[in-house]
Regions:
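Metabolite-binding pocket within alpha/beta catalytic cores that recognizes anionic/polar moieties
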Residues: 1-127
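Short, flexible loop segments at the rims of nucleotide/cofactor-binding pockets, characterized by
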Residues: 55-60, 158-160, 177-178
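Generic hydrophobic/aromatic pocket-lining and core-packing "Φ" positions
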Residues: 68, 170, 186-189
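Alpha-helix C-terminal capping segments
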Residues: 72-75, 91, 176, 190-198
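Active-site rim beta-loop-alpha module in soluble metabolic enzymes
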Residues: 128-174
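Zn-dependent metallopeptidase/amidohydrolase metal-coordination segment
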Residues: 183-219
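His/Asp/Glu-rich mid-to-C-terminal helical/loop segments that flank catalytic regions of hydrolases
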Residues: 210-238
């Protein structure tokens, strides 16, 4: 089964023909939102709103373990995670799409493993390649079939949030080789790997210029909306 996790710009999936809503209780508490079951294009999928349907949960307060555990308990084998990111690589244009192939973790204090040595033994999970190559290739094939341009290689930097970074921090991330910044890709990808769920991160890019003044402009919002519309159309073609 495929799960789609929607981010801040995709708290709902209008194209989903909903057949069931389910509240899932896990050993780690409740999920961010009830889980929706339904039909999207040719596939039966489940949908989870990472920040809640009304975007009320900050990145550092998301119950990532409950979200991933719940999807695993429902038989999910593949996750496509949708996010809006900020491009700090000048080559990444506002409104473009990107499929990261690596990441750097700048978060702290998040519950980022199921294996804490209590109920579950300590396991050192292989995370050398953080995203599933096969699932990424499927998404790349879909974008190619629809003639939608996409950056197929990028380093995703996951920030703690919810604040935005300083100029000095952005300069540091660039020196580290980061292309795009987000706040939710970790520990989501790690937890999925621990439960052997294939995981790919499908992102829409906003330019760092949109946030220089600390206020998003109307043009930036429009570009983000258009990029997310493209992602929804591509998902509908799965």
């Amino acid at each position: 089964m495929l799960a789609i996790i929607g981010g801040s710009s995709l708290t709902k999936l209008p194209e989903l023909e909903i057949t069931e809503r389910k509240i899932v209780r896990t050993p780690y508490g409740l999920t961010s939102s009830p889980i929706l079951f339904g039909r999207l294009g040719r596939l039966d999928i489940v949908f989870l709103a990472r920040h809640g349907f009304s975007h009320t949960i900050a990145p550092h307060e998301i119950n990532y373990r409950a979200n991933i555990w719940a999807l695993h308990s429902l038989g999910v084998e593949n996750i496509i995670a949708i996010s809006s990111v900020v491009g700090i690589n000048p080559d990444f244009e506002n409104g473009s799409l990107v499929l990261p192939d690596d990441l750097i973790d700048y978060t702290y204090g998040r519950k980022d493993t199921f294996f804490e040595g209590q109920e579950c033994p300590v396991i050192h999970t292989d995370f050398f390649n953080p995203y599933c190559d096969e699932l990424r290739q499927e998404l790349l094939n879909i974008t190619k079939a629809h003639n939608v341009p996409i950056y197929d290689s990028a380093v995703y930097g996951c920030l703690q949030g919810p604040r935005r970074p300083t100029r000095a921090e952005i300069a540091r991330y660039r020196r580290d080789g980061v292309d795009v910044l987000g706040m939710t890709g970790i520990p989501e990808a790690v937890l999925a790997r621990e439960l052997k769920i294939a995981y790919a991160h499908f992102c829409s890019v906003s330019s760092i210029d949109c946030f220089d003044s600390g206020v998003e402009t109307e043009g930036c919002n429009e570009q983000t909306f258009m990029a997310m519309t493209k992602i929804r159309q591509l998902l509908n073609g799965l």
